[in-house]
C-alpha cells in the first residue's frame, strides 16, 4: 500500500522561528551535544502562538503543535544554525486522525526552504524537501508504510541525520528512509506537523537533542 504525496499542493501556515541573532554554524566532536530541550522551560526558545487555524505552545513539560485546518502544515524552530546534525525527539499523537504528518526539520533556511523527515500515526514515512514553499519527497515518489512506526497515540522516537548530502530517517532505532540532497549544507533545525483532509492534528514532542554525527 502506498500513499500519494499531497502536500505538494498544500500550503504552509507558518514557520515559527525566532528573529533573534543566530550563531554561526557549529562544528564539534562526534557525539557532542549541540542543543537539547526537554521543554520544561517555557523560555527555551520555541515559538508560542495561538490562532484559529493552528497553535504551538509548551504544555505539561512537552511542546505541542496543533493544526486545526485541513491540508496544512506548520514548522517551529529554536533559531539556531548548524551544519551536519543528528536530531532526535520523542513524538506522540494527542488528538486528531491517524492520517496525519509529523516529524523533524533540518537545514531550515526560511519558511519555504528546508528538509523534512516525516511519519504518520497510521504508519507511513518519508523524507522530503520544501523549495520556495513547494514540498516533494526525496526518498520515494510517495510516503511508504513502515512496520517500525508505532501507530495511534503511541510514542515514537524519531531521529534525522543530516550529514553532507546524506539524509537518513530513523524510527525507534531503525532506519526507515534514506535520501540524498544538495540544496543546502547548513541551517536551523525544527519540528513539523501537518494535516490532510481532516484537521485537528495535535502532536506532543519531548526530549529533543541535537548532536554532532
Regions from the PLM with identified roles:
Residues 27-50:
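Extracellular carbohydrate-recognition regions
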Residues 39, 206-210:
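Extracellular beta-strand elements of beta-rich domains used
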Residues 54-73:
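Short carbohydrate-recognition loop motifs
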Residues 18-20:
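C-terminal motif of bacterial Sec signal peptides marking the signal peptidase cleavage site
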Residues 179-206:
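Flexible glycan-contacting loops in extracellular carbohydrate-active proteins
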Residues 67-132:
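Secretory/extracellular carbohydrate-interaction modules
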Residues 133-157:
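Short, aromatic/His-centered strand-loop micro-motif at the edge of beta-sheets
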Residues 154-168:
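Localized edge beta-strand/strand-to-loop motifs within extracellular or lumenal beta-rich domains
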